[in-house]
């Protein structure tokens, strides 16, 4: 949004118009849960996909090279309410020396739809909202980390969504892992935008 102010000094015949001030409405963190489909990649090691939306950075989702098959691996979600999505954040596995290696996502796509997802889990009716890539601040080879790399990973990687729209269902597809493994692990996802229902908004989620 943008706005200007107009002021007419006393005894003046002209009004003074300020330069336009440009701002953004606040984005809210939307709740979500797993939407079960047969094409959701199976879990291994007891790292269930529900961990991606529990607010706990010590738990996460882990697929396997065996049950999951080759990449891409994917998971489907239902938002608590239709939301005009603008940004999202992904927290990779960054405890100890895990950041930017092994099954942490390196390249991935995000998809959205408002239609009830097909029971066969196909992409019919879905819109790709963007392609995203994790970037290691130091640029050093896999297995070598700086303090800045670790801090960046633990803070979560934020992305603007290029195809802004109102969606109820989301799907993430991991195309490539940092370690080149055919398995995926990360800890948490967060989605931010503008709710499109007239229900109350929980300000604690800002």
Enumerate the predicted regions with their spans.
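Activation corresponds to long, low-complexity, non-globular regions
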Residues: 1-27
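Short amphipathic beta-strand/extended segments with alternating polar/hydrophobic composition
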Residues: 3-5, 127-133, 206
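Aromatic, loop-rich ligand-recognition surfaces of beta-strand-rich domains
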Residues: 7-16, 44-123, 155-205
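N-terminal short leaders/motifs
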Residues: 18-31, 139-145
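Tryptophan-centered motif/residue detector
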Residues: 25-33, 61-62, 126
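Flexible, small-residue-rich N-terminal segments that precede or flank a structured functional core
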Residues: 28-46
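Amphipathic alpha-helical interaction segments
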Residues: 35-36, 53-55, 134, 140
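Extracellular carbohydrate recognition and processing domains
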Residues: 124-160
